[in-house]
């Protein structure tokens, strides 16, 4: 579309204004030189340096990329100059610009007003029209661009191209918006207009390569700065930052690709770190569980049991959760790699989920064996404690007996009558019988206990043996020696003694023996029942039955003593000085023993019932736990095999698994009920299974967690495929721009409005490209673009493609079409410092910069 003709009549107030004329001359001269310098040329006086047409032709060739033909390079005469300038004016008109009132003669005659009018027309066509289609639309689009970029800046409100820029803040805001590293806007003195203008002009010239087309005086020494000069200068900002935006867009595309690969690499690194730490913990814990050094006391073993219980309650569950989370991370990583068509992640040996599960199973086996070893050791220590108590009780009783007898035997009293001497001899005979009975029974019991302690690997057996042997060798032998001495003394005095009351002696002897048996029998009747199985109860029952058989034989001895007592009473001897116990006392002990026997029978029956019931519960727990464990294992296999290439099919499969898992919950509740019954029964070990409630619950939760995380990953991947790649901020920007150019609010843009809208947001299309876009998105063919069609175009044009070609293309834009990219270009296009560091560390260095092509190839291998 052609430019509107530029009036050059004397009514043009802007050209008549001398100050504006001076400003335009300066600005237009700088603009021309910004292009002529590409050819190594320049002008100094805009009204004289174009009079021969040579530099004017150079300017037109640079800005239009189209040569001006047949220009006389060595004009000699005025007619030659007019011909050259005429060719230039025709060249301008050939690009769709109508020149009204501007002739070659006026330019050759150095008419400043005509020259400035011509240059303004050129600026409109080649510098500002590419922002829109015609002057009004171009001005509006450029103004909208300034307003959007300076929105939110303190005391900056752009409403025109003259007074709105007079304080310099708008220029500073435009620079800060795009290059915040160049200006600290908050530190500016908002009232220092000259300082702000000078700062903006200097930075634009030095850092942005925008020539200084205006001076501070051009903006401040007039009430209203020249609009054309300001527009020309602002257009330089637009074109500079538009080029930067392309590089930034390419940088964002590269950034998205890098985010994906960096996240995958970080996920791999995190998995390996956590997996290594977990496997190390499992190995260390398994080594400690394989130790069997539990100490040599019940308290020590119970301390180990408490520590093991606390470990299973507090230390192990988080590690079990870590197993589940690592498997979820591993499967999620594989799913993401598969969905983006990358090679699967291969973990080092020993760190795959299956290998970790195997290591975990070995740990649980070690736990089971550790718990069993503790149970056996506690049982052993309890047996040792009972045997030691019994051993000490027997030996203490012997020591007390020996001490008592030593006092008696050491008196050496013979009595004052034959009866008394005979009584002492009889008493000594009773002592001898009791001594032999005690020695035989006690020594047998002590040896039996020592044998049992030896079998239990009790390390104190030598000390106990030495104590026993020392007692019998010293104190016991001393008592026997004293008895023998005392007996000889009595016999020496007994020549006149006669046998007195053999029956009393017989009673004393037999009663003492029976009394010893009754006291020894207490151990079979009153010892506590300490078992944890049906077999244990049966073993005690067998020993008890053997004892009952012996008891029936001892009962015959009691009846014989009863008959002997009756005979003594009939003879008038109710007292028996030779006996240590009376029949009534012996009978009372016997009756007490009988009561204990009956109670023992009840205890054994109850214990058998209890252990039988506990065993039934253990078997029920084992069956249910095995069922749930098998179900979890099969379901986990199903999840790991859910590898369909269709994400929706994967999602349907995993959701079906989650639903079925929820329906299985009552079976877990049933297991909890059985476990509660076992806990109430104080059953801590189950020989029918190695599963515990905690291990089943851990497997159950692991399945639940893995399924849900798998669901989340697949849902996320489906959603990722549906995303457009356009941010909410960009969508809001598209809507605001569309509404601005939709003047009649009919939710449609005509061709001119659509083109202006695209250019206001930085999309510059040629006429051919614009025609192709409209024919593609105007689906109803009505010649207008609806908001929905506009958004579809913006989304499709900004949706990144994840391929090696698209990534290379993005890098090429950032590198300004070179085959290598510099660090400065990377930092100019990408703002994320982590992404910048990653690129600088990963890209191969080449002469002049970095090889982005080989880097992109490596990314997609």
Curated annotation (Swiss-Prot):
Ca(2+) 1 binds at residues 742, 744, 746, 748, 753. GO terms for molecular function: actin filament binding; calcium ion binding; protein-macromolecule adaptor activity; structural constituent of cytoskeleton. F-actin cross-linking protein which is thought to anchor actin to a variety of intracellular structures. This is a bundling protein. Increases the actin-stimulated ATPase activity of myosin. Involved in vegetative cell growth, phagocytosis, motility and development, probably through stabilization of the actin network in the cortical cytoskeleton. Belongs to the alpha-actinin family. Homodimer; antiparallel. Gene3D superfamilies: 1.20.58.60, Calponin-like domain, EF-hand. Spectrin repeats lie at residues 240-365, 366-480, 481-601, 602-714. The keyword Cytoplasm applies. Residues 22-127, 136-242 form the Calponin-homology (CH) domain. Its main location: cytoplasm. Residues 1-239 are annotated as: Actin-binding. Pfam families: CH (PF00307), EF-hand_7 (PF13499), EFhand_Ca_insen (PF08726), Spectrin (PF00435). InterPro entries: Actinin_actin-bd_CS, CH_dom, CH_dom_sf, EF-hand-dom_pair, EF-hand_Ca_insen, EF_Hand_1_Ca_BS, EF_hand_dom, Spectrin/alpha-actinin. GO terms for biological process: actin crosslink formation; actin cytoskeleton organization; actin filament bundle assembly; cell motility; cellular response to starvation; hyperosmotic response; phagocytosis; sorocarp development. It comes from Dictyostelium discoideum (Social amoeba). This is Alpha-actinin A. Changing residue 789 to A: Decreases sensitivity to inhibition by calcium.
């Amino acid at each position: 579309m052609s430019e509107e003709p530029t009036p050059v009549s004397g009514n043009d107030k802007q050209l008549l204004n001398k100050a504006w004329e001076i400003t335009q001359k300066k600005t237009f001269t700088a603009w021309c030189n910004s292009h002529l310098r590409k050819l190594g040329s320049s002008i100094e006086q805009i009204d004289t340096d174009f009079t021969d047409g040579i530099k004017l032709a150079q300017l037109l060739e640079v800005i239009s990329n189209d040569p001006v033909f047949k220009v006389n390079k060595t004009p000699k005469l005025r007619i030659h100059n007019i011909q050259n300038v005429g060719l230039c004016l025709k060249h301008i008109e050939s690009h769709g610009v109508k020149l009204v009132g501007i002739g070659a003669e006026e330019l050759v005659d150095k008419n400043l007003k005509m020259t400035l009018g011509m240059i303004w027309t050129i600026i409109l066509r080649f510098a500002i029209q590419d922002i829109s289609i015609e002057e009004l639309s171009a001005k509006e689009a450029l103004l909208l661009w300034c307003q959007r970029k300076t929105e939110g800046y303190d005391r900056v409100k752009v409403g025109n191209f003259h007074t709105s820029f007079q304080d310099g803040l708008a220029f500073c805001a435009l620079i800060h918006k795009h290059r915040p590293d160049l200006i600290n806007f908050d530190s500016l003195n908002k009232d220092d207009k000259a300082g702000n203008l000078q700062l903006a002009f200097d930075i634009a010239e030095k850092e942005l390569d925008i020539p200084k087309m205006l001076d501070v005086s051009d903006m401040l020494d007039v009430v209203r700065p020249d609009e054309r000069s300001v527009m020309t200068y602002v257009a330089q900002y637009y074109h500079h930052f538009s080029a930067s935006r392309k590089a930034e867009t390419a940088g964002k595309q590269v950034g998205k690709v890098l985010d994906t690969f960096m996240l995958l690499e970080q996920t791999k690194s995190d998995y390996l770190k956590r997996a290594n730490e977990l496997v190390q913990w499992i190995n260390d814990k398994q080594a400690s569980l394989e130790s069997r050094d539990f100490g040599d006391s019940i308290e020590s073993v119970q301390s180990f049991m408490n520590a093991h219980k606390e470990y299973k309650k507090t230390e192990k569950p988080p590690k079990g959760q870590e197993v589940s989370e690592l498997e979820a991370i591993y499967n999620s990583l594989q799913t993401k790699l598969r969905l983006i068509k990358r090679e699967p992640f291969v973990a080092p040996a020993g760190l795959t989920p299956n290998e970790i599960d195997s290591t975990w199973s070995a740990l649980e086996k070690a736990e089971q064996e550790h718990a069993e070893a503790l149970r056996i050791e506690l049982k052993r220590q309890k047996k040792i404690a009972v045997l030691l108590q019994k051993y000490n009780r027997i030996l203490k009783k012997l020591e007390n007996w020996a001490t008592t007898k030593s006092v008696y035997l050491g008196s050496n009293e013979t009595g004052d009558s034959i009866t008394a001497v005979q009584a002492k001899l009889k008493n000594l005979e009773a002592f001898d019988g009791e001594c032999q009975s005690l020695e035989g029974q006690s020594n047998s019991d002590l040896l039996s206990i020592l044998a049992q302690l030896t079998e239990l690997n009790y390390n104190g057996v030598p000390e106990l043996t030495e104590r026993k042997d020392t007692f019998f060798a010293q104190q016991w032998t001393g008592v026997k020696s004293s008895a023998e001495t005392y007996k000889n003394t009595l016999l020496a005095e007994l020549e006149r003694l006669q046998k007195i009351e053999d029956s009393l002696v017989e009673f004393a002897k037999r009663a003492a023996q029976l009394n010893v048996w009754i006291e020894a029998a207490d151990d079979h009747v009153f010892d506590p029942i300490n078992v944890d199985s049906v077999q244990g109860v049966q073993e005690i029952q067998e020993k008890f039955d053997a004892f009952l058989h012996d008891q029936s034989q001892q009962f015959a001895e009691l009846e014989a003593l009863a008959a002997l007592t009756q005979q003594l009473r009939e003879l008038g001897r109710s007292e028996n000085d030779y006996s240590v116990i009376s029949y009534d006392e012996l009978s009372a002990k016997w009756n007490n023993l009988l009561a204990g026997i009956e109670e023992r029978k009840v205890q054994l029956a109850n214990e058998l019932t209890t252990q039988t019931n506990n065993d039934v519960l253990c078997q029920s727990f084992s069956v249910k736990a095995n069922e749930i464990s098998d179900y979890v294992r099969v379901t986990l296999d199903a999840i790991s095999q859910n590898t369909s290439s269709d994400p929706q099919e994967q999602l349907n499969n995993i959701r079906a698994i989650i639903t079925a898992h929820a329906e299985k919950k009552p079976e877990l509740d049933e297991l909890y009920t059985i476990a509660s019954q076992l806990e109430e029964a104080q059953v801590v070990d189950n020989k029918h299974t190695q599963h515990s409630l905690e291990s089943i619950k851990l497997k159950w939760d692991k399945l639940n967690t893995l399924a849900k995380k798998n669901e989340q990953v697949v849902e996320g991947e489906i959603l990722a495929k549906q995303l457009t790649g356009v941010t909410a901020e960009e969508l809001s920007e598209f809507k605001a721009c569309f509404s601005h150019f939709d003047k009649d609010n009919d939710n449609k843009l005509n061709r001119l409005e659509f083109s202006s809208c695209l250019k206001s947001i930085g999309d510059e299309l040629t006429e051919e490209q614009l025609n192709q876009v409209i024919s593609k998105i105007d689906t109803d063919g009505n010649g207008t673009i609806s908001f929905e069609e506009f958004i579809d175009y913006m989304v499709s044009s900004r949706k990144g493609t994840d391929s090696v070609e698209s990534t290379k293309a993005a890098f090429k834009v950032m590198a300004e079409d070179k085959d290598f990219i510099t660090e400065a270009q990377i930092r100019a296009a990408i703002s994320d410092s982590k992404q910048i560091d990653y690129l600088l560390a990963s890209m191969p260095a080449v002469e002049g910069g970095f090889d982005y092509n080989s880097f992109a190839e490596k990314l997609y291998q």
